[in-house]
């Protein structure tokens, strides 16, 4: 685990089939630390999560529950996801304790609805620091650019494009993706470049 931004830490798990990293995040906050989309944690990372404490585990979408059950078990932190995605993850064996809704505040972030990949996908935006954390709304691949997942894995491609177009209107300098490489500068421009490729 390393500090990618002040107070935001990340660790990765490489996906051979995809050819890029899946990323988990730990965000320090005075009201309690947040763990976002926790990927498989090596022993030292799991020990650190336990030592530093996690107040809440928040999940961006139904496919990013990942190792939330393990982190919940070890830290005692409740797991939250949007209710539209909750039934699917419960069927997969995930334990969900709370709901996330667009407009809600979670630590330093505003919860932003980005449906399309799944009906309940959310992102986390910190306007003060111009940071956006996403799950599957966009991926950081190829490195330095942003792209969408293949349409066959999207519930509603047109709705996702509309969601991403709305993200491009936010004030964003840094984008931290659940999948792929982070964009640490000019992320708003990378989002707008992606939106410019969408069909009219």
Report each predicted region and the residues it spans.
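Short, acidic/polar N-cap/turn motifs at the starts of alpha helices
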Residues: 1, 22-24, 99-103, 121, ...
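Metal-centered catalytic cores of metalloenzymes
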Residues: 1-2, 6, 28, 43, ...
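Short, compositionally biased "basic patch" segments
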Residues: 1-25
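Beta-strand-turn-beta hairpins that frame and shape the catalytic cleft
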Residues: 4-9, 29-33, 104-112, 127-131
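Metallo-beta-lactamase
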Residues: 15-19, 32-35, 41, 52-55, ...
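Active-site HxH/HxHxD metal-binding segment of metal-dependent hydrolases
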Residues: 40-107
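Internal catalytic-core helix/loop-beta-alpha segment
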Residues: 95-125
